[in-house]
Amino acid sequence: MGVIGHNGGPVLQPASGWKRHCWRQARAALLPTLPVEVVRMRVARARELGLDYKTYAGVRAQTGHDVVAFLFSSNALRAMPQQPQIPPDHAARLAALQAVGRIGLAQRPLTARDLARNPELDAAHPAPAAFASFRDQAACLRAALGTLPGDRVILIAETALEREWCAAGRLAACLPAAAFFGTGVTAAENPRHSGW
């Protein structure tokens, strides 16, 4: 029997061509390969969701599920108490989303009823209160999601306080509003990670 760590990787001495070949083959065998048809379907789904493929694939790999809804904070939607109507550029972005739920979270003093008047949203609910406890945030988000599983929902957030909702709601990912509504979405944030 060998010593502890005897199979911990290649030795530090210069490897022969055969050893390099074996290690490359072993590493390549660890990476999953998807059939071209599956990749095409996932690229098409990412397009329906308005996400780049890298972001969609990352969320899909992390959760093991497809995205069924987006959760938008009223700040991310630029809906304010004086002007609850979503700006035209944001409304067009929401209208372009296909085969996915669009749920708004109204932050006080904006009411969920005012936010729900936007036809681009499928539903609107009150957002967790500012500085609410983790438990209260989780309960509020669970009420907003209804029967939707949290790990299939992506949060679009504007502020640091809103990003905390991702962990509280056990959501799939959190994307910055500027990236989602701006030039394009980059990489998704891990909901277990607090920093951006």
Predicted regions, residues:
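Extended, compositionally biased intrinsically disordered regions
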Residues: 1-11, 192-196
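A short acidic (Asp/Glu
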Residues: 56, 68-70, 115-117, 163-168
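Long, compositionally biased
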Residues: 71-103
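Flexible, charged surface loops at secondary-structure boundaries
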Residues: 95-100, 115, 142-151
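Structural motif
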Residues: 105-111, 129-136, 155-160
